[in-house]
């Protein structure tokens, strides 16, 4: 259940990009930390060194509660599994990065929120050979990694060897092969999509049923869907035996836009517009990343204002979803009552 929850509630590609800024600036942040400031997560680092002697190649604190460890690539699945199951970590997100101009390699980051004992963030980093872009898949050991590894494969062309599900995740079926959007040198917009065919190229998987099940397609456009998404229900009579789905129909390529067309101070306007009802959360995430990368101390008053606005936005989102639950069941009067409350709670 935990693995499926975190896969379904994957934390969005925009957040991945801005989190990369924080991680890549690790050297700057490490120097800016006060020597007297307590660094959280030291016992996790000690546990890693004890369980895997000689595997940790480097480590650095980005902030007092954010630790990045670079490990040998062949030990990646074991290290993530150890932190996930033995140390109480939750795999929050994973992403790739093109660091060839920095060190000649690609890199993949697995970000875990440590919830057992001392709470902090630990990011497991591995360098991937630019000439042979392969690394061992974590998914067979930690199933929650499947979405992230599929996305890294799509966007960077880094192959997770042993990944059980090799279907595309973000890119459409007619996207040109060997064109990976988030590589730094991926700027050839002259390539065109492959010709479309009547045959379906994306295979929806029915793991729990068999070929006797009827298939009920829902989407990608449906009256009850807020965003485009295609669901396949495998049914036996009235019982749903299994389900599979495909999202990212409105993927807008915001990372590439921010990277190639905007300065650091202009991305805030883009992050505000990622989502119609949670713009402040996205803009706060980006701003916090830049502040951490630059070693900027945020005034307490600014932190309090952010907390208040984030809480108002959270309540706003809860009310909206409660109203939508009423709408989906045909109780539109309930939806309108919640919508009326939204008018008085909106941060704007």
Describe each PLM feature range:
Residues 2, 149-150, 283, 312:
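A generic alpha-helix preference that emphasizes hydrophobic side chains
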Residues 6-239:
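Terminal low-complexity/charged segments
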Residues 167, 173-179, 183-239, 243-346:
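Catalytic cofactor-binding cores of redox enzymes
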